[in-house]
Amino acid sequence: MDHRLSPELDELRRTVEAFAHDVVAPKIGDYYERHEFPYEIVREMGRMGLFGLPFPEEYGGMGGDYFALGIALEELARVDSSVAITLEAGVSLGAMPLHLFGTEEQKRQWLPKLCSGEVLGAFGLTEPDGGSDAGGTRTTAVRDGDEWVINGSKCFITNSGTDITGLVTVTAVTGRKPDGRPLISAIIVPSGTPGFTVAAPYSKVGWNASDTRELSFADVRVPAANLLGEEGRGYAQFLRILDEGRVAISALATGLAQGCVDESVKYAAERHAFGKPIGTNQAIQFKLADMEMRAHMARVGWYDAASRMVAGEPFKKEAAIAKLYSSTVAVDNAREATQIHGGYGFMNEYPVARMWRDSKILEIGEGTSEVQRMLIARELGLTP
């Protein structure tokens, strides 16, 4: 398989690389330390068309694909993951469900605003008692005439409480199967709907310039037409969304891993000890060689999964492999980058400190490492 980028994708990569270094890098540290959402940066990403990368032009998109999104995510995450996860969640979790499962009316209503970055969408799946048990949904939606009445709560929801958040698509139990198992459906809840409460932002270890909230629904009424896809198919729909999202998270994790290499190579050339740059020491060189090797192989993994996805081939196993490996690599490279920087790696003014804090969530969000191993084993034909 040829993993070299086409001229168009390489141009996109270079454009986002320049944006990340020229616009994001000088500003993001201050946003991060203030735990402040970077509206200025997000607006510029919208003007660049990044939120519309994988969507058709007829809905305001750029006419690209998921591979293009991955390229943008990797380049952003080489500099900062808060900005990258805002794009990832806005596209793969906020807008993609509407594109894949929405009615024509829903697409016309929401996608142009989502593709332009004027509005952010969010994905409400995880619940306080759920975690990896995504099927254990307790939020309910009861049909009352031409409306759904929603009650319940969601947690750890990215992009759900910004000033430009326009909607959250939530999963809710809408009935029971003959055997008693829940029928889970997906329903669009516009921001500001009465009874829909967004809590204050979480105080997080990392991703401090991104928006993450807990959501509560108390007799929230939305039109019956806000059902996304078929009733009872919400869980299956979001399993597909999560498969695709794992490829995007893998690209993001690869970017963080590569960013650790970038910063460490630069520091190793500048930092002198015992009369010479520390990069001349074999111990440092071997660390950097291993870090580059890991980042490179993580890139091969997500390129493979994304290539299969856009070609319409099965990619579930490859997505799980890419997500598992790249997130592990991100944590490993962040740890080694901090070690290479020594005491300075523990100081917040150095980007590697931010990368270290941001890396761990990649082994948890959008499917833990343990869940990825379960998925891989299942794809190998193994059952519990």
Region roles according to the model:
Residues 87, 114, 129-132, 158-163, ...:
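Short Gly/Pro-enriched turn/cap motifs at secondary-structure boundaries
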Residues 95-101, 123, 135:
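Flexible, glycine-rich active-site loops centered on histidine and acidic residues
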